[in-house]
Amino acid sequence: FAGNASAAAAEDAPLWFFWTLQRLEAQIGAKKIWKHYGEAMKQVLESYKRGVAGRVALNDNGLVWASSDEVPLTWMNSVIDGRSVTPRNGYQVEVNALWYNAVRYALRLAGEAGDTKFVKAWEKLPERTAASFNELFRLPKGYLADCVGCDGANTDIRPNMIVACGLPYKMLDEQTQLEVIRTVRQLSLIHI
């Protein structure tokens, strides 16, 4: 992501890297993860903080904002005649769940490795991210908005919200997770 213009069209891909490292940690341990991948993890997080190609940026509320009508920025977008089929400009639910997971994971590894400089620079962000996420994405209907943009919350029920329940570091309380899982399960059964 850092310095790679082609990666800017896949705002969630660098964040899945952290999830992959979480799986790898079970095999090789946290110390080796930080030793071999710590710098790459920091670079990815810093690239979001700086912003990427004028399309992806970390906002003051701790959430990642992405916007482009020409380039599909998430896994579910396709382009026809140069336009996104499913535009999701703004804060996407799965991207911000992945973002929170990535930051919390990096903070844990850095703390265990004694990287106090990194910890000091990033330690306050997760609380702000979680508060903003819950304020913007949680809907009274018991599920999460798919994305939140300039026009408000997109309340279409899409399976993207399940990512917020399936990562090692979550921003949702247990009751909300159960409601999200129930909603996604009902959606899946309806469309089979």
Predicted regions and their residues:
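Short, surface-exposed linear patches
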Residues: 39-40, 80, 186-189
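Catalytic cores of carbohydrate-active enzymes
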Residues: 49, 53-61, 100-189
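Aromatic-rich carbohydrate-recognition surfaces in CAZymes
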Residues: 1-73, 92-96, 100
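A structural signal for alpha-helical segments
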Residues: 5, 29-36, 87, 94, ...
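Carbohydrate-binding/catalytic loop surfaces
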Residues: 1-15, 57-88, 140-163
